[in-house]
């Protein structure tokens, strides 16, 4: 879970300035992050649950990602796993996130109002703290188009805040 995004000039979420106040998380929507065990993504696995069909494993939203898709020139050993363990993020702007105690902007069905104004985040400490001396030069990020089936859908924004 991330802290509320904060900018000194033109803040998108003014509640970020509130310390020890329940309003601090009022625009936080639900963000799920997870990895899928390779047992569920291998077509030839005898341990795969029966309800997962080969069609399920071919669907872009549920299939495994092979090393060759992301790193086409990487040589894998004979005992290496060919499926890349990826961090999956799923954002639900209509659903209340953790510590969101906002009671005013909620629809009668319990979903959040103004989903376009909501945010979700995840944060992690990066070691070491001096990225320049550690020779960290870029972030590599692979994004699956969430609108594969609906090209008319309006998207959101993705931000990376490196501190």
Give residue ranges: language-model regions.
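Surface-exposed, low-hydrophobicity segments enriched in Gly/Pro/acidic/Ser residues
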Residues: 1-163
């Amino acid at each position: 879970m991330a802290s509320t995004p904060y900018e000194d000039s033109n803040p998108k979420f003014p509640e970020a300035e509130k310390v020890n106040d329940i309003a601090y998380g009022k625009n936080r929507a639900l963000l799920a992050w997870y990895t899928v065990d390779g047992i569920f993504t291998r077509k030839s696995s005898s341990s795969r649950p029966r309800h997962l069909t080969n069609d399920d494993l071919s669907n872009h939203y549920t299939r495994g990602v092979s090393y060759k898709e992301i790193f086409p020139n990487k040589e894998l050993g004979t005992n290496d796993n060919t499926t890349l363990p990826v961090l999956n993020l799923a954002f639900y702007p209509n659903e209340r996130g953790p510590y969101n105690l906002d009671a005013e902007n909620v629809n009668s069905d319990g979903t959040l109002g103004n989903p376009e104004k909501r945010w979700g985040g995840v944060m992690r400490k990066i070691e070491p703290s001096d990225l320049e001396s550690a020779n960290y030069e870029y972030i590599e990020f692979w994004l699956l188009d969430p609108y594969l089936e609906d090209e008319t859908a309006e998207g959101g924004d993705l931000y990376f805040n490196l501190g």
